[in-house]
């Protein structure tokens, strides 16, 4: 962290002989629990993406702070969507007390704000990942990428003071730091082509009539289109695409029911456009004629689940949004939940 933040991160140097390397522990002196959780998660589960020939890979931001300063030549130049960082944050705090969850506006301030005297006591993203080393890249004015950041799904917390680790576990209820998550990283030479980023959306897909919203057909690909107020008229079986939309002063929240949909990010995508259109695409794995389990082959009888194959769900939020301020989580309960910030300037024009 920068020299202007001694009261938030305090390196504690253990007494060693001159021949031994100094042992440094990081202490987070952040009084507010939700700020502590946010900064701890970002600094522990993410780190500079270093070239392998310079350092062993996947050291967290806190580990790097405890060891040395990083220079640009040591960084890989890879790119990660900022929404991926937010997704990891929301995944970790999914079961915490609601009072510990950072509101979207404050979360955006954490990532966007620059260090100055007015926020001296407030932890910021730039304290862990300085802009000169980890600049943001915009693609099509919709996606925010951060350069040279890597996700660590099983971080080493030995550089943190024990009370910090204990506080994190107490607030989250987690006993282990290991996560079963994967995060997309784009390798880059310093230039990102738009067609390398937005490959999931096929503009040729046309929505079906709203009377069929919430149903899954037996064709190669089904598409569900709905206005926020539309409800499904379908009956029977588990349906892909049932949804709910919420609104607050500065953001929209949507939830989409996706039972039987493969959660592997290689097959699943969710994209938000600036006009509020949301397009979800993926693959269903249920509804087959035969199911193999434990060397047995079962012939399915009722077959009321969605048939296996590709699908897409599209709908429109009530107003324009900032697509690069979108974070989502596809949980094991089969519910896709997303939060996206409103574009208030366009709404007032």
Curated annotation (Swiss-Prot):
Disruption phenotype: No visible growth or developmental defects under normal growth conditions. DNA hypermethylation.
Keyword entries, A-Z: Nucleus, Stress response, Transcription, Transcription regulation
UniProt keyword Nucleus present: yes
Main subcellular localisation: nucleus
Ranges for region Disordered: 210-230
Protein induction: Not regulated by heat.
Subcellular location per the Swiss-Prot or TrEMBL entry: Nucleus, Nucleoplasm
Consequence of substituting residue 246 to D: Loss of function, but no effect on the oligomer formation
Domain sHSP, chain residue ranges per copy: 233-349
GO cellular component assignments: nucleoplasm; nucleus
Tissue: Expressed in cotyledons and hypocotyls in young seedlings.
Domain of life: Eukaryota
Family matches, as SUPFAM superfamilies: HSP20-like chaperones
Assembly with partners or alone: Homodimer or oligomer. May form an 16-mer complex. Interacts with MBD7 (via C-terminus). Interacts with IDM1 (via N-terminus). Interacts with IMD3. Part of a complex made of MBD7, IDM1, IDM2, IDM3 and ROS1.
Annotated family: Belongs to the small heat shock protein (HSP20) family.
Record function comment: Prevents DNA hypermethylation and transcriptional silencing of transgenes and of some endogenous genes. May act as a molecular chaperone of IDM1, regulating its H3K18 acetylation activity.
Name of the protein: Increased DNA methylation 2
Organism: Arabidopsis thaliana (Mouse-ear cress)
Gene this chain is encoded by: IDM2
């Amino acid at each position: 962290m920068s020299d202007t933040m001694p009261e938030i991160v305090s390196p504690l140097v253990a007494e060693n002989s001159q021949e031994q390397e100094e042992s440094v522990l990081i202490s987070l002196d952040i009084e507010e629990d939700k700020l502590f959780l946010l900064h701890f998660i970002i600094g522990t589960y993410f780190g500079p993406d270093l070239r392998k020939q310079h350092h062993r890979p996947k050291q967290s931001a806190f580990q790097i702070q405890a060891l040395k300063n990083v220079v640009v030549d040591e960084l890989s130049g890879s790119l990660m969507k900022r929404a991926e960082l937010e997704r990891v944050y929301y995944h970790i705090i999914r079961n915490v007390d609601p009072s510990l969850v950072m509101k979207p506006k404050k979360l955006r301030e954490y990532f966007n704000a620059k260090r100055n005297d007015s926020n001296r006591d407030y932890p910021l993203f730039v304290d862990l990942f300085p802009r000169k080393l980890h600049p943001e890249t915009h693609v099509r004015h919709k996606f925010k990428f951060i350069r040279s950041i890597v996700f660590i799904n099983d971080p080493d917390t030995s550089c943190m003071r024990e009370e910090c680790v204990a506080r994190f576990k107490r607030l989250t209820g987690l006993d282990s730091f290991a996560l079963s998550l994967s995060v997309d990283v784009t390798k880059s030479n310093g230039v990102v082509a738009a067609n390398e980023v937005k490959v999931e959306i096929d503009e040729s897909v046309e929505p079906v009539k709203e009377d069929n919203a919430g149903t899954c057909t037996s064709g190669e690909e089904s598409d569900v289109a709905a206005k926020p107020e539309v409800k499904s008229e379908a009956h029977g079986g588990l349906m892909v695409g049932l949804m709910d939309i919420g609104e607050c002063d500065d953001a929209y929240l949507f939830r989409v029911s996706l039972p039987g949909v493969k959660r592997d990010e290689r097959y699943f995508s969710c994209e938000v456009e600036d006009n509020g259109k949301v397009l979800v695409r993926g693959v269903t794995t249920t509804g087959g004629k035969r199911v193999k389990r434990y060397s047995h082959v079962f012939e399915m009888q009722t077959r009321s689940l969605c048939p296996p194959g590709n699908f897409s769900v599209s709908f429109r939020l009530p107003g324009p949004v900032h697509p690069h301020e979108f974070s989502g989580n596809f949980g094991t309960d089969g519910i896709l939940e997303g939060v996206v910030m409103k574009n208030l300037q366009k709404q007032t024009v």
